[in-house]
């Protein structure tokens, strides 16, 4: 009798499974994803074959979303967060929770293969960006220091692949204005140049009761030139130079009421500000050999910024902080890597 009780549930499960298989008429749609190639200075491979988590955003998507800086990527790039602390000076980037608000960054930033070592240079105006890649996870093996959280690669449009003139004008409330102009020209098949510039303005959102003026107004402008030359079939040379100037008002900070835990009004007497001058120049050389390539990146970056902040956040003159910084950074990197489609690849560099 006990054996009979064990056999009946077995057959019931078999019949139920068979009926489920017969009644399942679901058709699953299979979609072949488009090929995405990592264009990094360190590597060039199909993103689908890479053992890492990455996101790639095209220039069209950037324009459609009206993205003007890295901070705005936080809304749709997984595991990427760049908080806004009130000025471009404090611009930490966090990937998977790894980042640094002070000292050296934990996420690396490269623009056309040129490294940006200082966090205060991360928050710059996007203009004519062709593509952005976010590589999540430690990248120290290929990129070295300050890449524990990941890497952000920004690529601008190439004058050898794109020609024309673009004009962008936008206006909004609170005095928000954005004007941009760019021109791309190819001379023959071997030389091309690109010139672009933009201006952004914001009258601010918070009023300082002491001065009766906006506390967080902002004006910024940038200019950029890019030259590309292919003197031979296997040799490519490039020169990039950019200049960025930002002038921001102070921080819309207010004293918090410890009893009600509510913020008070912005009301302080000393004028607060952040002013930054950023200049970056880079030279690139790439040679494609038979099964290998030799690549070089030379860069120089100059940063000069000035910060003043009323840190008592009150109408009284108690504590005012001033910070000035000037940095000159030079970098040189050369690598040689395999370009074959074999199972194994190699790379050497310094």
Language model segments and positions:
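Short, acidic, small-residue-rich periplasmic hinge/interaction motif at the N-terminus
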Residues: 21-61
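N-terminal periplasmic accessory domains that precede
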Residues: 70-73, 92-97, 110, 134, ...
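Extracytoplasmic beta-strand/coil segments of soluble accessory domains associated
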Residues: 71-114, 130
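Short acidic/polar hinge/loop motifs at secondary-structure boundaries
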Residues: 112-138
């Amino acid at each position: 009798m006990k054996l009979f009780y064990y056999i009946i549930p077995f057959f019931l499960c078999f019949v139920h499974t068979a009926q489920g298989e017969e009644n399942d008429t679901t058709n699953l749609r299979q979609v072949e994803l488009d090929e995405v190639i990592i264009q990094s200075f360190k590597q060039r491979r199909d993103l689908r074959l890479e053992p890492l988590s990455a996101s790639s955003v095209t220039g069209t998507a950037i324009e459609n979303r009206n993205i003007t800086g890295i901070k705005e990527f936080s809304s749709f790039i997984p595991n990427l967060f760049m908080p806004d602390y009130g000025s471009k000076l404090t611009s930490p980037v966090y990937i998977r929770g790894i980042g640094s608000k002070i000292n050296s960054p934990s996420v690396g930033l490269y623009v056309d293969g040129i490294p940006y070592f200082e966090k205060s240079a991360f928050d710059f105006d996007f203009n004519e960006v062709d593509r952005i890649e976010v590589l999540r996870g430690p990248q120290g093996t290929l990129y070295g220091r300050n890449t524990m959280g990941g890497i952000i690669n920004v690529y601008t449009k190439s004058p050898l692949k794109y020609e024309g003139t673009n004009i962008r004008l936008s206006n909004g409330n609170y005095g928000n204005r954005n004007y941009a102009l760019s021109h791309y020209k190819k001379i023959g098949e071997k030389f091309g140049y690109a010139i672009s510039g933009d201006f952004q303005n914001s009258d601010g959102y918070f009023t300082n009761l002491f001065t009766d003026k906006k506390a967080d107004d902002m004006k910024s402008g940038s200019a950029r030139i890019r030259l590309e030359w292919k003197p031979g079939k296997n040799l490519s040379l490039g020169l990039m130079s950019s200049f960025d100037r930002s002038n921001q008002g102070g921080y819309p900070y207010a004293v918090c009421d410890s009893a009600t835990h509510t913020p008070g009004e912005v009301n302080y007497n000393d004028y607060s500000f952040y002013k930054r001058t950023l200049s970056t120049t880079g030279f690139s050389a790439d040679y494609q050999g038979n099964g290998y390539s030799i690549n070089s990146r030379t860069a120089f970056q100059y940063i000069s910024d000035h910060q003043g902040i009323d840190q008592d956040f009150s109408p009284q003159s108690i504590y005012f902080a001033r910070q000035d910084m000037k940095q000159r950074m030079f970098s040189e990197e050369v690598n040689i890597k395999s370009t074959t489609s074999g199972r194994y690849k190699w790379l050497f560099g310094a």
